[in-house]
């Protein structure tokens, strides 16, 4: 059955996207399992224990008991390295890339961590994975801008579902607030998703007051060319009326 992978840089609204996929009820939804295997250790999924990313990726394309899978991952060097080495997974999965303006990523990260250790990750690494998917010769990768997702959730999710051949379920655009077992190990990163009941844009664009911070500006300068390149491929989402 199909494997639907969503890749994003940190702080790009990907957990809200994941929460919507859980709400559908028709997918085996996996929250950052590759990252967990790299940084925490063996992982149990569906009654099976996986020791490595390679084991998990092989299972995803070979045997998921006939169910469709949704996999959400934040792209960092270890995760990207394990995926680009698996050309079968690159070619057979349906890949989507959720992008966000680099200055917004940086401000959101810095507000939590007070550092920019993701300086060499971000949209640059996401772009590298996008190119690897293109070169694998499988399904064309999909790009969604998170700004479109919060500006017009119904249209954005309908366009995504059409692109990856999933039925659109309007009821999955809203959910009950609360923490979720899938992201319990990293819950402090997901407070916005946990307190939300749907896709909502922040009331103030610079809610952290960091738009002019030099670290934010440096990150934005580094990653904006890669964000803009990915923007060339993003789904055309109409503005909400």
Regions found by a protein language model. Give the residues of each.
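PAPS-dependent sulfotransferase catalytic core
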Residues: 1-67
């Amino acid at each position: 059955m199909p494997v639907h992978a969503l890749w994003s840089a940190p702080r790009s609204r990907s957990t809200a996207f994941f929460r919507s996929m859980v709400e559908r009820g028709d997918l085996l939804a996996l929250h950052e399992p590759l990252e967990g295997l790299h940084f925490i250790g063996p992982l149990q999924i569906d009654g099976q224990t996986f020791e490595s990313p390679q084991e998990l990726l092989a299972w995803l394309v070979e045997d998921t008991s006939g169910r469709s899978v949704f996999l959400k991952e934040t792209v960092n060097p270890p995760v990207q390295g394990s995926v680009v080495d698996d050309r079968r997974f690159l070619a057979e999965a349906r890949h989507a890339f959720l992008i966000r303006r680099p200055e917004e990523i940086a401000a959101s990260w810095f507000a939590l961590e007070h550092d920019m250790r993701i300086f060499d990750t971000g949209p640059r690494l996401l772009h590298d994975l996008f190119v690897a998917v293109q070169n694998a010769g499988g399904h064309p990768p999909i790009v969604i801008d998170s700004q479109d997702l919060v500006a017009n959730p119904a249209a954005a999710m309908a366009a995504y579902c059409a692109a990856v051949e999933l039925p659109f379920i309007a009821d999955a655009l809203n959910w009950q607030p609360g923490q979720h077992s899938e992201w319990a190990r990293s819950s402090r990163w997901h407070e916005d998703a946990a307190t939300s009941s749907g896709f909502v844009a922040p009331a103030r664009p610079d809610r952290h007051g960091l738009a002019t911070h030099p670290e934010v500006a440096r990150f934005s300068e580094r990653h904006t060319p890669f964000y803009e390149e990915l923007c060339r491929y993003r789904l055309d989402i109409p503005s909400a009326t």
